[in-house]
Amino acid sequence: HFAASAQITPDATYMFAQRDTCDLYMDVYDPADGSETSVNGVEKPLVIFMFGGGFIRGTRDDESYNGWFRTMTENGYRVVSIDYRLGLKGSNKVGIAQVNVLDKAIHMAVEDLFSATNFILENADQFEVSPDNIVISGSSAGAISVMQAEYEIANGTSWASVLPEGFNYAGVMSFSGAILSREGKVDYKKVPCATLMLHGTSDELVPYNQIKVFNLGFFGGGKLVERFKKFGLNYNMYHFTGYGHEIAGSM
């Protein structure tokens, strides 16, 4: 976990969506001067980041992420940290029993991520990014959101229909994430993009394996790896044996 004290200020802030309850903004952190923005002639991706906080709290500019933003920009990446609506704000403890509430919160965040993505795609020249070179990343609730977003795209759901036809992200980075499925398991109709997962095996907030009630399941990194292996998908998984949810802040 990088030092939170490493101060870094955004190079730009844009409003990317207006909702009934709030306006949504994104902070853009450009690659540091003199940093390497390409590898062997290939441009490094733009990285969208979604903060954590259990869909109850959290902000795009929480100083605990400053160290990671600085490290990424010093390594030649453009980072875009986005707002999303907190669908569980004001809720009491939400577990699998209140799954409809959780489902709504996750998809609200996914909807906001897709709006941010469309804003970047519509202004690709300004962001100096190719449409096929955007990576999504997140911590905790943000990690759930990015994993769920790719699940929606790979399965061609109505949620993903707001994106340009044929669009997909270049990759997903999940710090203690999971996927919510009503199908009893996680299947992909189309091949998902390359996925990096980090998860503590003793995580009690976002399950490392799964929580399942009938066909409804919340599938963490440990369980998802089994599916990724089975289908020969492109993934990298870092298991942190004995660690809990602190891995959500390990970037």
Question: Which stretches of residues belong to each language-model region?
Answer:
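Short beta-strand element of the alpha/beta-hydrolase
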Residues: 41-54
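The feature captures the conserved acid-bearing segment of alpha/beta-hydrolase catalytic domains
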Residues: 160-231
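Alpha/beta-hydrolase active-site loop
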Residues: 100-126
